[in-house]
Amino acid sequence: MKIAIVGATGAVGREMLADLEDSKIPEISLSLFASQRSAGESLPFRGKSMEVKAFSLDKMQGMDACLMSAGGAFSRQSAKAIADMGVTVIDNSSAWRMVEGVPLVVPEVNPEALRGIKKGTIIANPNCSTIQMVVALKPLLDAFGIEQIHVSTYQSVSGTGQRGIKELAHQVESLFRFQEPKCEVYAQPIAFNVLPGIDVVDSQGHCFEEEKMVRETRKIFGKPDLSVLATTVRVPVYQAHSEAVSVKLGKAVTREEAIKAMSGFAGLKLHLDDSHAAFPTPRAIAGDRAVHVARIRTPIDVLNSPWLQMWIVADNLKKGAATNAVQILEAISYH
């Protein structure tokens, strides 16, 4: 299978490369592309050193698939042209997610969206914070139905890419030197701070990250009227996103019934030890491909409640981006 990674030197592109290293796809002929600025860099793949080349449209000719993680503007400009060459494009940006007819896919959750996929299709990779939430909630949706979701996120700086990682590192260093931190990526310092909004804020006070979570969840679950209330927050963590989620199910359930429904679901790891030392944290799970769920509970002092609360953690560069994209590629490569 001839595969191109566009944006190979970025935070997600590097993880795509790492996930392809362990992929189920038996024979891979891989080409790496990035901007002119990053061209010439070498990256390892299956024991070889591979040169990253400057992207140009003609270099996509003859590819079977393109894993794209080069930002929304680039994707809007190039993805359709690449797909028109007969190349299947799996795009990690937000550019195509809500476009009618473009599959928005989490393989464990809505694999039916990949049925009948033909070469030359654009497939959208959902938002990182959306992916981990829908994986955790899908078995509950199937078992009990879902009427409403409340989610507050604690999102790491790697969600902004390498520049977010560097800004946090530089600001921490500056503060320890008693220097004023410079803000180039975020509007306020992120070091030792919490920023209560991600991306552009609209006239109604909703930020774009929240809009993504609401609309993508509805599309993936096939429930266009589902009530989703989201508050997205940037925190001074390098890698992995966390979420506090409350979900109103279609019926009252016990903690035990919820755990039974979630147990064994693909890509989901339940942490049932409720001691503080056992809780999954961003630091503990960084680099892992699973979605981790803990603190599963029903509301305090409320009997027969349809509400369920939980803590969800996943690596935003892995399952939240690269791993999900490679899983999509694995699924379509078997057609």
Provide a role label for each language-model segment.
Residues 226-335:
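C-terminal active-site/capping subdomain that shapes the small-molecule cofactor and substrate pocket
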Residues 117-124, 193-204, 310-312:
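Helix-loop-beta segment of a Rossmann-like dinucleotide-binding subdomain
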Residues 121-132, 205-214, 320-324:
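A glycine-rich, Thr/Ser-enriched phosphate-binding loop motif common to dinucleotide/cofactor-binding enzymes
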Residues 1-190, 225-227, 278, 285-287, ...:
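N-terminal Rossmann-like NAD(P) cofactor-binding subdomain of oxidoreductases
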Residues 191-238:
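Oxyanion-binding "anion nests"
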Residues 17, 214-218, 259, 263:
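Generic solvent-exposed, charged/amphipathic alpha-helical segments
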Residues 167, 188-196, 238-243, 247:
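Active-site-proximal catalytic alpha-helix in oxidoreductases
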